[in-house]
């Protein structure tokens, strides 16, 4: 038996060191497909209680020793650092290095870390394994390596470009989000990272995803820059039927903003990682859905065929909109998903979850296909995710976009010039754009508006905004039943020419 094992290892080594050998997503897909045909094995924690039961402040004390960054002794611009297990990051992930001739496991060692005041026995953690990893790159200065990618927890990953700070997250896959049965969170259980050459400007990462009802193989090509772009290829296999599959999911946070002001006095006018869902539908329509922090779970679906793009955006970059020196929400990126090929019929879905503070991610957006194959059959999805602070460049230049949405008590100016509340809710929506700024200010811009059965549009007016060189829509709305949601839409036109994206707003219930 020992001889056979040695022979098998020798054969594998020969394959890995063959000059014709090259690692690819197909190698990961074979494992994913094999896993899909077997019963799910839940990951087992090997974490000592001192790490499992620690508080966040203690976990923060465990820091990677920067002098021991992986590839530190190579000329490659990319470096790797690793996350230690602790708290709810209590199961190890395997991390491998891929070279031109071989795959090599990157082994855990406590010597990679400094532990602060955390008391531990080195012998009990010597084979612990990592919780995840981060990628460093000289994105802001050629003399300094900054973190640009973090892969930690379930299938979450965060990415930033030049001058950005971490905000929203992307995920590999979402299953049954917002369904009564409860959400299932797939996890990346193993990674393979290609060793980059000194001249490489991109980093390739492969990942094996596992979950009770799905497996998957992923290839991520990270291209850092002013906008960091991640090219994603995924091969997904169902173990069992799911209620809903979320492809290219994005996760963010919205606590309050001018469309839904803070119920308590707060020096910060806005507090969010993203303030809207942008969609470029298959028929060419652009849609903007401002985000809410509802009192009850809210799910919005936008049905279409072959989406051209969608993303959770942070529109409005002035520091004065946030006034937060610690968390710098003005520097947090937007994330824009651009599908490759035809994704067929389905929906872009937005999930908004009530939250009382900014520590909870309460916003999710993803693509969900109408039809799913039988378990075991392969699904392929290719797309890019662009992490950017230049939201106007994510939009068509000839189509105006919503710069801000503000909610106010509706009022009417009396003959004595005093404004008197009239029982309505007023929405102030500013539209701007490169082509719109070229229009003469006397252009007869009007609004096409509509509202659902639970509301009535009392008045809508459009006027030129000389500050933004765009147009401002003011719409006064009367809600029939405040216990129900109210849907409304608006777009700017000039005669039969559509000038703007569609503002699609949902006023939450009980507001």
From Swiss-Prot:
Cystine pairs: none
Any single Gene Ontology cellular-component annotation: outer membrane-bounded periplasmic space
Gene Ontology molecular functions: carbohydrate binding; catalytic activity
GO biological process: beta-glucan biosynthetic process
PANTHER family documented for this protein: GLUCANS BIOSYNTHESIS PROTEIN, GLUCANS BIOSYNTHESIS PROTEIN G
Entry function: Involved in the biosynthesis of osmoregulated periplasmic glucans (OPGs).
Family: Belongs to the OpgD/OpgG family.
Official protein name in the record: Glucans biosynthesis protein G
Organism: Shigella flexneri
């Amino acid at each position: 038996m020992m001889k056979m094992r040695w022979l098998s290892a020798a054969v594998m080594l020969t394959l890995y060191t063959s000059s014709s050998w090259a690692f690819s997503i197909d190698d990961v897909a074979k494992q994913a497909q094999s896993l899909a045909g077997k019963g799910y094995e839940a990951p087992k924690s090997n974490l000592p209680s001192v790490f499992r039961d620690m508080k966040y402040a203690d976990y923060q004390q465990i820091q990677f020793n920067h002098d021991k960054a992986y590839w530190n002794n190579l000329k490659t611009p990319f470096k790797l650092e690793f996350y230690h297990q602790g708290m709810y990051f209590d199961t190890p992930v395997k991390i491998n290095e891929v070279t031109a001739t071989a795959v090599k496991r990157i082994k855990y060692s406590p010597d990679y870390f400094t532990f602060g005041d955390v008391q531990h026995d080195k012998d009990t953690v010597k084979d612990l394994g990592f919780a995840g990893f981060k990628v460093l790159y000289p994105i802001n200065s050629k003399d300094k390596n900054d973190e640009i990618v973090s892969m930690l927890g379930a299938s979450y990953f965060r990415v930033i470009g030049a001058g950005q700070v971490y905000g929203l997250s992307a995920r590999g896959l979402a299953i049954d989000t917002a369904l009564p049965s409860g959400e299932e969170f797939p996890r990346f259980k193993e990674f393979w990272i290609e060793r980059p050459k000194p001249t490489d400007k991109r980093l390739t990462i492969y990942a094996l995803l596992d979950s009770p009802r799905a497996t998957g193989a992923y290839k991520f090509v990270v291209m850092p820059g002013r906008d960091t772009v991640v090219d994603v290829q995924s091969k997904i296999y169902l173990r069992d039927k799911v209620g809903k599959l979320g492809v290219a999911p994005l996760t963010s946070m919205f606590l309050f903003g001018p469309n839904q002001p803070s119920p308590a006095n707060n020096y910060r006018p806005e507090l969010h990682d993203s303030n809207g869902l942008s969609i470029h539908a298959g028929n060419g329509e652009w849609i903007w859905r401002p985000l809410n922090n509802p009192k009850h779970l809210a799910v919005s679906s936008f049905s279409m065929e072959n989406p051209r793009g969608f993303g959770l955006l942070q529109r409005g970059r002035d520091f004065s909109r946030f006034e937060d020196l610690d968390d710098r929400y003005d520097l947090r990126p937007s994330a824009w998903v651009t599908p490759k090929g035809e994704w067929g019929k389905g929906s872009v879905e937005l999930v908004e979850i009530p939250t009382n503070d900014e520590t909870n991610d309460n916003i999710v957006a993803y693509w969900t296909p109408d039809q799913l194959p039988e378990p075991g059959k392969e699904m392929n999805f290719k797309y890019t995710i662009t992490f950017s602070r230049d939201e106007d460049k994510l939009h068509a230049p000839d189509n105006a976009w919503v710069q801000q949405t503000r909610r106010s008590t509706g009022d009417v100016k009396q003959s004595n010039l005093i404004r008197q509340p009239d029982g309505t809710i007023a929405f102030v929506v500013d539209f701007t754009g490169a082509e719109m700024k070229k229009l003469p200010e006397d252009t007869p811009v009007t609004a096409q508006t509509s509202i659902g059965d639970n509301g009535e549009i009392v008045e809508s007016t459009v006027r030129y905004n000389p500050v933004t060189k765009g147009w401002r829509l003011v719409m006064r709305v009367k809600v029939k039943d405040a216990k129900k949601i109210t849907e409304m839409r608006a777009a700017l036109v000039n005669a039969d020419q559509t000038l703007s994206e569609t503002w699609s707003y949902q006023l939450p219930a009980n507001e």
